Amino acid sequence: MHLTPRETEKLMLHYAGELARKRKERGLKLNYPEAVALISAELMEAARDGKTVTELMQYGAKILTRDDVMEGVDAMIHEIQIEATFPDGTKLVTVHNPIR
């Protein structure tokens, strides 16, 4: 199997998001990379499922709360930007203050 660099990056992000999800389910508080990976992976999957950019921007702010992350992580993440694949092409999605 030959993957482009972009496809490899998407797979790595998906795997990191899955690892973060499992840690969250075990009751662990997520660190910065885990929080970003989980939110990004969730947004990419929701885009693939057909949600709009606006829906993703709203959904991205509901995935994690301050109680889900280590102290100070929420203050470190001001925005998350991903390029997501939608049924009509690739678009940039920005979620401001994703952890509330």
Swiss-Prot record:
Pathway: Nitrogen metabolism; urea degradation; CO(2) and NH(3) from urea (urease route): step 1/1. The keyword Cytoplasm applies. The keyword Secreted does not apply. One of its GO terms (biological process) is urea catabolic process. SUPFAM superfamilies: Urease, gamma-subunit. It is found in: Cytoplasm. It catalyses: urea + 2 H2O + H(+) = hydrogencarbonate + 2 NH4(+). Pfam families: Urease_gamma. Keywords: Cytoplasm, Hydrolase. GO terms for cellular component: cytoplasm. Its main location: cytoplasm. It comes from the Bacteria. InterPro entries: Urease_gamma, Urease_gamma/gamma-beta_su, Urease_gamma_sf, Urease_subunit. It is an enzyme of class 3 (hydrolase). Heterotrimer of UreA (gamma), UreB (beta) and UreC (alpha) subunits. Three heterotrimers associate to form the active enzyme. Belongs to the urease gamma subunit family. NCBIfam families: PRK13241.1, urease_gam. This is Urease subunit gamma. It comes from Acetivibrio thermocellus (strain ATCC 27405 / DSM 1237 / JCM 9322 / NBRC 103400 / NCIMB 10682 / NRRL B-4536 / VPI 7372) (Clostridium thermocellum). The lineage of its organism: Bacteria, Bacillati, Bacillota, Clostridia, Eubacteriales. The gene is ureA.
